[in-house]
Amino acid sequence: LVFVVAISDIATVNGKICEKPSKTWFGNCKDTDKCDKRCIDWEGAKHGACHQREAKHMCFCYFDCDPQKNPGPPPGAPGTPGTPPAPPGKGEGDAPHPPPTPSPPGGDGGSGPAPPAGGGSPPPAGGDGGGGAPPPAGGDGGGGAPPPAGGDGGGAPPPGA
């Protein structure tokens, strides 16, 4: 009976396993045991290991490719909605904060805010993250005072006229 169980475990290992870069590991991965524990505890993986890819040591998590056998991260894992993140530990690869989440345009995440709907350039980066008021619709994104009311203004006609 033990022999049959061992064979079924080997068949599981040789089954289809999907490799994905860890979503919770930051920095170089040099501690495979720590990577393995984080993949299992935080990401619901079957296994984790450090590998060098593209000249970087990264933590990779291994999941069962069958979605029915891979329920996802365990409850209470960092990044699970409605649960507080675990406090960061010490050492390389520890996240200084929880995994990044999508932020609205004008926030401080990502490569910068999206351009305004009316055109023009996005607000300068590195500000307070507030964003401010959008430019007037149809504007060119430039500043300056509006033309005086009435009169021809002596300039080119407005767009669409």
From Swiss-Prot:
Residues 1-8 form the signal peptide. InterPro entries: Defensin_plant, Scorpion_toxin-like, Scorpion_toxin-like_sf. PROSITE patterns: GAMMA_THIONIN. It comes from the Eukaryota. Epidermal anther cells. It is found in: Secreted, Cell wall. The keyword Signal applies. Residues 16-65 are annotated as: Defensin-like domain. Residues 70-88, 96-105, 113-125 have a biased composition (Pro residues). Keywords: Cell wall, Cell wall biogenesis/degradation, Disulfide bond, Secreted, Signal. GO terms for biological process: cell wall organization; defense response. Residues 70-161 are annotated as: Disordered. It holds the Pfam family Gamma-thionin. Disulfide bonds join 18-65, 29-50, 35-59, 39-61. Its main location: secreted. PANTHER family: DEFENSIN-LIKE PROTEIN 1, GAMMA-THIONIN-RELATED. Anther-specific cell wall protein which could contribute to the cell wall architecture of epidermal anther cells via intermolecular disulfide bridges. Belongs to the DEFL family. This is Anther-specific protein SF18. It comes from Helianthus annuus (Common sunflower).
